[in-house]
């Protein structure tokens, strides 16, 4: 394992030059201190977890110190926000410190969020607050533990630096890790500013770094776009299967790697609600839970438009057509597993839709339903879960269909079934009220709850003794927390 000063940098994106990013130094925050660190994320850089508790750790990730080989850059990009094109966005408060490669030969971008003003800050102060930094940290590591592709979070560093949002808060910095920070909006920026040479340079860079196998195809750009479509279809299937609502699916928040990117007013479903809107600025419900599926396709078509200089419209259209069938296949596969089914039948989609409608009508807790379904034999589980439903007749009818469906798979060892179902149905999810409790404590200077919650969420499928309160239904106040974009 390495110490912090032993990291090996290789700043490939910075070498593309000033058309793609601007050199900016981070602005330090006052009295930096460690709020929380992720040993699992540190392991991606081969870092010794003990390094998190050294004074230099807080200094490096708060803008006070910088590695000699680091080359901090603010990236330029644009994007469609709530369906409307915004010509210039860019890193308004985050800096790509550089790329580090580990012993396994993997490259990881180090991106410092809340690092101060950049040429792309617009009217912003370039800062991130403790509240939003903790939320992003917990979400990144929780999604990873659920096997949902995501950027990772190495640490949050708190400070005494005041910042103004709806009220005075304290600034913090978060160190985000990802194999790439290239967004759909990077390609859109060079397309709409009519700079085909730079767009080609960006495309060639992305191909060489992240899709080298596509270079062997007759049309490398088309092969790359196809893979971006495939990855995003699979990602959104996982969001829907686990009840994750992103909240701000603008094209500048979409990763070319198909990983969850940029955490704002996100939420996991408590009660199942297909029309749930987690972002209280989203008046029209553009990014509601059920809309994430068509919006994924809309965003891919916005990327396709930006790739028309390199790929024929016909080929792009055909490739976009793969998205929905791929999404459906992944989603149904995940939901069969959540229901404890090991084979596929034609009517499974109907069985699932029927269940979700019943859950919607009765306000049933989405995560706990699936967890409890695996606790006992199908007959006993259905009998136990019945009390959660208002439409008893409807649920009884569904229960009969479900029990018969399971029976058609043959005799199953109940203990094996329980293990198999519990391995895909989490006991612990990042509910907004749990995050809020941890934030309230952290804002008073107590970081123990953030650290405890992070540890619990890092192992969501295993029952953890003494942690029962993290697996409970939310209190009424916890169900309707409105989360804004302010961060």
Indicate residue ranges for each PLM-predicted region.
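ATP-dependent phospho-/nucleotidyl transfer catalytic cores
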Residues: 133, 162-246, 257-357
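Short, contiguous strand/loop micro-motifs
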Residues: 25-26, 125-127, 222-223
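Conserved ATP-binding subdomain of kinase catalytic cores across diverse folds
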Residues: 31-34, 39-57, 62-218, 257-259, ...
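Regulatory N- and C-terminal appendages and interdomain linkers associated
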Residues: 1-78, 278, 283-487
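N-proximal short alpha-helices
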Residues: 7-15, 112, 116, 126, ...
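Catalytic-loop Lys-Pro-X-Asn motif of eukaryotic-like protein kinases
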Residues: 251-252, 256
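Phosphate-binding glycine-rich loops and adjacent basic patches that engage nucleotide phosphates
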Residues: 1-7, 17-22, 98-106, 120, ...
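Short, highly charged low-complexity linear segments
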Residues: 157-159, 245-247, 361-366
């Amino acid at each position: 394992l390495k110490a912090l000063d032993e990291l090996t940098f290789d700043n490939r994106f910075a070498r593309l030059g000033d058309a793609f990013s601007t050199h900016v130094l981070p602005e330090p925050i006052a009295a930096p201190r460690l709020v929380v660190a992720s040993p699992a994320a540190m392991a991606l850089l081969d870092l010794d977890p003990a390094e998190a508790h050294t004074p230099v750790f807080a200094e490096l990730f708060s803008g006070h110190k910088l590695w000699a080989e680091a080359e901090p850059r603010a990236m330029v990009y644009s994007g469609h926000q709530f369906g409307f094109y915004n010509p210039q966005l860019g890193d308004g408060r985050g800096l790509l410190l550089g790329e580090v490669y580990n012993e396994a030969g993997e490259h990881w971008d180090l991106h410092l969020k809340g690092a101060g003003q950049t040429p792309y800050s617009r009217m912003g102060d370039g800062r991130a607050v403790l509240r939003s930094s903790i939320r992003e940290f917990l979400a990144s590591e929780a999604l990873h533990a659920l096997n949902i592709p995501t950027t990772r979070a190495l640490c949050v560093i708190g400070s005494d630096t005041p910042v103004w949002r709806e009220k005075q808060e304290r600034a913090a910095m978060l160190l985000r890790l990802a194999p790439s920070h290239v967004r759909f909006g990077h390609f859109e920026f060079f397309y709409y500013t009519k700079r085909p040479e730079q767009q080609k340079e960006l495309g060639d860079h992305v191909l060489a770094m992240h899709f080298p196998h596509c270079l062997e195809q007759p049309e490398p750009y088309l092969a790359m776009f196809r893979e971006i479509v495939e990855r995003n279809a699979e990602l959104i299937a996982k969001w829907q299967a686990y009840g994750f609502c992103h909240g701000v699916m603008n094209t500048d928040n979409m990763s070319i790697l198909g990983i969850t990117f940029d955490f704002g007013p996100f939420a996991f479903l408590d009660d199942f609600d297909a029309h749930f809107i987690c972002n209280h600025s989203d008046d029209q419900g553009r990014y509601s839970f059920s809309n994430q599926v068509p919006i994924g396709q809309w965003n891919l078509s916005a990327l396709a438009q930006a790739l028309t200089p390199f790929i024929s419209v016909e080929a792009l259209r055909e490739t976009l057509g793969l998205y929905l069938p791929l999404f459906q296949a992944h989603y149904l596969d995940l939901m069969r597993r959540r229901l404890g089914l090991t084979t596929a039948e034609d009517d499974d989609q109907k069985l699932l839709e029927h269940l979700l409608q019943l859950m919607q009508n009765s306000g049933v807790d989405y995560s706990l339903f699936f967890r409890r379904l695996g606790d006992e034999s199908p007959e006993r589980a259905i009998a136990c879960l019945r009390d959660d439903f208002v439409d008893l007749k409807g649920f009884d009818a569904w229960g009969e269909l479900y029990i018969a469906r399971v029976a058609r798979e043959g005799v199953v060892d109940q203990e094996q079934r329980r293990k198999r179902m519990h391995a895909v149905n989490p006991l612990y999810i990042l509910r907004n009220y749990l995050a809020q409790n941890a934030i309230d404590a952290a804002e008073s200077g107590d970081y123990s709850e953030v650290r405890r919650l992070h540890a619990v969420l890092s192992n969501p499928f295993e029952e953890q003794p003494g942690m029962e309160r993290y697996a409970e239904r939310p209190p009424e106040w916890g169900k309707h927390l409105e989360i804004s974009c302010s961060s």
